[in-house]
Amino acid sequence: MILPIVGYGDPVLRKVCEEITKDYINLEETIANMYETMYNACGVGLAAPQVGLPIRLFIVDADPFSDSDDISKEEAAALKGFKKTFINAKMLKEEGEEWSFSEGCLSIPDVREDVYRNPNITIEYYDENFNKKTEEYNGLIARVIQHEYDHIEGVLFTDKITVFKKQFIKKKLQNIMEGKARPDYRMKLVPKKR
């Protein structure tokens, strides 16, 4: 089932999310719905808060990046078929010289900005079968994971750009909060205050 994606300004996007257990109600269905929602919106990652759930769950499918002409053959091979579910993730390490890449977010439609992130990460998480894993990633895969991990920590990519750049996107963010954004996918708009 395709779920509506929560838009910028909704308080759930600013929550530090709660861990879940393997007995979480409808976990398998929630994960399946998140993948369907992400694919419908042409995304490469989606975190549970983006569908209104304040839980430590996010998904990544970096395969679409594997067709890019701007990456090495080695990175393209790593991206090809990369699809994972991350539950109760903990970022153990972020290291290396930060590099910039233009990021966007399904909760912030039509906004893209350069964000600096470390190229190498070590992350601990449970997969969809609740098998505990500790893995290292680098490059674009690491970046997508960091972006989605930020969501479960209540952080958005717009928090990582300069004050100067924030001024340029201020009107777009306001439009999203006012329900004026019109992406090609279902969105749950922030309720207007009365």
UniProtKB/Swiss-Prot annotation:
**UniProt keyword list:** Hydrolase, Iron, Metal-binding, Protein biosynthesis
> Which Pfam families does the UniProt record give?
Pep_deformylase
The record's active-site residues are 148
Q: Where are the transmembrane segments?
A: none
Q: Which domain of life is it from?
A: Bacteria
Q: What is the required cofactor set for this protein?
A: Fe(2+)
A biological process (GO) annotation for this entry? Answer: co-translational protein modification
The entry marks the following residues as binding Fe cation, namely 105, 147, 151
**Which Enzyme Commission number(s) are on file for it?**
3.5.1.88
User: Can you state which reaction this protein catalyses?
Assistant: N-terminal N-formyl-L-methionyl-[peptide] + H2O = N-terminal L-methionyl-[peptide] + formate
**Record keyword Iron present:** yes
The record's section on InterPro entries has: Peptide_deformylase, Peptide_deformylase_sf
Sample GO molecular function, one term: metal ion binding
Looking at its record, which EC class is this enzyme?
A: hydrolase
Q: What does this protein do?
A: Removes the formyl group from the N-terminal Met of newly synthesized proteins. Requires at least a dipeptide for an efficient rate of reaction. N-terminal L-methionine is a prerequisite for activity but the enzyme has broad specificity at other positions.
Please state which protein family the record places this protein in: Belongs to the polypeptide deformylase family.
PANTHER family with a match to the protein in the record:
PEPTIDE DEFORMYLASE
Task: Please state what the protein is called.
Answer: Peptide deformylase
